[in-house]
Amino acid sequence: MNQMNPAFVMPDVQSTVDTRQIPIQRVGVKAVRHPLTVRTESGDVQPTVGVWNLDVHLPADQKGTHMSRFVALLEDSREPLTVERFRAMLASMLVRLEAEAGRIEVTFPYFVNKTAPVSGVQSLLDYEVTLAGESRNGETRLFLKVLVPVTSLCPCSKKISQYGAHNQRSHVTIDAELAADLPVEALIRIAEEEASCELWGLLKRPDEKFVTERAYENPKFVEDLVRDVAQRLDADERVVAYVLEAENFESIHNHSAYALIERDKRHAA
């Protein structure tokens, strides 16, 4: 077994000078699975598993970044995740990596306990959530993205049919840039309230009747869905910009109907 000479100094190759003089905009680690806890709107703590992407800007004269420091940051971040805690993580990463700019992104399943509309039975429904933050030129921007499954029912189908109307599951995806703390549940509520009907994990027969009739009484094209959600986001001062998408998985076609609205309130007329 080789014995290391106590006088030997292990070289730090990453910190050596790179003669090619080409900066790298983003370098780091991607798709790191790591457990985390999330602070919910009610103040409870929810355990989940996040998929993390962390990267920084690398100057032209530096050969490499310190990859292990990204994972060390996750190991040291044990407190429940909030928007402010996420902002602090981003600042800590820049200090640890001695970087002027960087980005952190984490995607995780988030569960909401929902009560059925008639029977009152409770069940969990999962949502895909992404929290992202980037710091550049002394400015920090935070983004909250939520994919919300809902039901949509076609107004045209209802109008032309003697009975019934085609309906389907849809995805509403809200990617919002935040001006202030905004609970995940707030974006979920906006999407669900503007859909033909929301979803539940568990329904009894009286609930299923309610859901069917609720959607029938509230038909919406994919265009209606994104416009109605956009109005809600426009009125929310906690959101400064957003990319909003709706996709209807059409039950009478082998393709989806799709719509997108993108708006930055800072540049609005």
UniProtKB/Swiss-Prot annotation:
Record-level Gene Ontology MF annotations: GTP cyclohydrolase I activity
Protein EC: 3.5.4.16
Reactions listed under catalytic activity: GTP + H2O = 7,8-dihydroneopterin 3'-triphosphate + formate + H(+)
Alphabetically ordered keywords of this record: Hydrolase
Recorded metabolic or biological pathway in which this protein acts: Cofactor biosynthesis; 7,8-dihydroneopterin triphosphate biosynthesis; 7,8-dihydroneopterin triphosphate from GTP: step 1/1
GO BP terms in the entry: tetrahydrofolate biosynthetic process
Site keyed May be catalytically important: positions: 154
Classification via InterPro entries: GTP_cyclohydrolase_FolE2, GTP_cyclohydrolase_FolE2/MptA
Domain of life of the source: Bacteria
UniProt similarity note: Belongs to the GTP cyclohydrolase IV family.
Primary role: Converts GTP to 7,8-dihydroneopterin triphosphate.
Name the UniProt record assigns to this protein: GTP cyclohydrolase FolE2
Organism of provenance: Burkholderia ambifaria (strain ATCC BAA-244 / DSM 16087 / CCUG 44356 / LMG 19182 / AMMD) (Burkholderia cepacia (strain AMMD))
Gene behind this protein: folE2
